[in-house]
Amino acid sequence: MEKIYVVTLHRYEDLEGFYADMESNGFRINLKRPISRNTHYYMTDAQAVQLVEDSRVLAVELRPEERGLFPRPLALINNLPYNVNGTFMKSGSSVNATDFQWGHIQVAGDATERGKNAFGSGGSNTKTGNVEVFNNGSDVDVVICDDPVSTDCKEWVSPATNQQRFQQYEWYNNLNSYVTSIDDDGTTLPTGSYPYVDQATNTAFHGNHVTGTVAGRHYGWAREANIYHLDVLSASATPVMALFDYLRAFHKHKPINTTTGRRNPTVTNHSWGYGADYSGDWPTGFDISDITSIVYNGVTYNSGNPGPNGWNFPGIEKDFGIGANKTQYPGRVAAVDADVEDAIRDGVVIIAAASNDNFHIALPTDTEYNNYVTAAFGTRYFNRGSSPGAATGVICVGAISNNQDQRRATFSNYGPRVDVWAPGYAIVSAWADPSVITGDYAGIGLADSKYGGNNYYYPINGTSMASPQVCGVAALLATNKKRFHNTDVSKLIQSQSISGEMDFDLGTGDFADYTCKKGSPNVQLHIENPRPTSGVCDTGSTDGPRLDSTKPSQCFPRRSTVFYAA
């Protein structure tokens, strides 16, 4: 019986020859994507196994939904500086509309303002402060890839011009000529006007919250950035398999900005990831009899050959990280990873959440990368992370908790594939109308007295909340850059981030210790004003040093605006 398989090639240059060979061998196309290395074909399982042997082919996989993998929101529920001055909320049951999210003071503040071992759960719930943020994100395009974002939320209004910054871009009408073509079965990608929603019709909240942290005027970082949105999570979403095709076409074909003389940088946030959710079938968790075997670092463990701590859930959680209540597993999709790599190569900046499964994420070169569990739900790799967050080149963000010490959040994935940690617990941001929201959060939300009308806010947790902290900071770094790729973002973030201040291994240090490090970087997001408060600029270059007129031989670094060549 024929099924639909996604065939991913190693090289884009091989596509035309591959198309011709597949056609001559009688394979029908389900979906041809000329901008992508991925093509969807009808074939049998036996043909799929045989096709993998073609040296041009990287992967042949069933579509992710047919493997039990679905995209999930990852929430648990010219420098123009500005100041963030007021109360920063980090923990507690009380929050006000005038509170700022604590990511601002954590990321832009100094050691005193961060208040380690004093500010947060176990210490003071709020902190009054004043931090300077060095830029506002003007002339940068941020794209929020998430569930629906309300077009009319007041958080998207420019503080400088009082104009709405949300761009209702017509993705299908403008870009379908670059993205898709009619295939053997007549299938096409969506057409017509893009299905935007406003506060009165937005049944979701996650996209609003993420957007608020990236670019909100009160809760966010890039307060003057242009805001774009692609829905990847709702019933009317853009097909995930075409998401990065649209992002690449958008980036390549956007007009020249007449103010800067160049195309705006494209900085994208992905607070979602593929995974398998078994909580519906096992609402109270797994029983040890549900687990058949675990292959860990090449050794097979089971009831007859248990690990050091025994074949029971306390034991296998300590030894391998497989817990009775871990009913969600991250999943990788080779076709999505290939699209991500191509988008990064084109210059699209991709920042993504590490995911909320509390699993160790290994690098492909690590022995742990090939660990898998066989259970009642099938066989799953559990140390590879999620697509797109763990794909090569993506800036993968883990979540810091709101404890007064600076530990990772207990839900956050961790390990060497995480690039940087950022605040992701009790993050206050924009919200949707509680009377319209459906699902578990129906009726939940707080009216935003700053704006009145149909505007709301609420604090939630997740790596979904950590990733937009990094995305927002990246948008600030992007302003006035002649080129701005993922490698540039990574270098800039790493050059400023704080090393060694996070607390790991506060318990036993094994996988059952939810503060375990296991190869995680001790690196948390940080930015600082790149210029001293006095002195004159070197007029020879916008990327040059800062000079103090009283000390003409002394140059101050401008780390936030350093240009890194390819």
Language model features with spans:
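Active-site-proximal beta-strand/loop segments in catalytic clefts of secreted hydrolases
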Residues: 9-11, 63-65, 144-148, 213-217, ...
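C-terminal subdomain of the subtilisin-like protease fold in secreted/lumenal serine endopeptidases
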Residues: 229, 244-245, 255-282, 394-396, ...
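Hydrolase catalytic cores
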Residues: 211-215, 223, 228-235, 407, ...
